[in-house]
Amino acid sequence: MVDKRNHYFLLHKIEELLELSASKYKTTMEIANYAKKTKNRNANKSNIKPVILAILEISGELKLNDINKLTN
């Protein structure tokens, strides 16, 4: 017979993993969409890849003005 404490513990861990997975997917999609906009806006004016620019801006490491300076 399955111990109910283990059963609830496993269910809790599964829920945690699903939430983390959904959060990572959401973040990945935000970065990808932002990178697509950045790529379209800057059209190969920079040696910095759009995904890296997106990560830096979303994380707060760079502001839009800084990115424009890098890509011009």
Swiss-Prot record:
Known EC number: 2.7.7.6
Location relative to the cell: Plastid, Chloroplast
Primary subcellular site in the record, as a coarse category: plastid
Single Gene Ontology BP annotation: DNA-templated transcription
Example of a GO MF term: DNA binding
Domain of life of the source: Eukaryota
GO CC terms: chloroplast; DNA-directed RNA polymerase complex; mitochondrion
Alphabetized UniProt keyword annotations: Chloroplast, DNA-directed RNA polymerase, Nucleotidyltransferase, Plastid, Transcription, Transferase
Family designation: Belongs to the RNA polymerase subunit omega family.
Function: May be involved in RNA polymerase activity.
Protein name per Swiss-Prot or TrEMBL: Putative DNA-directed RNA polymerase subunit omega
Species annotation: Cyanidium caldarium (Red alga)
Organism lineage: Eukaryota, Rhodophyta, Bangiophyceae, Cyanidiales, Cyanidiaceae
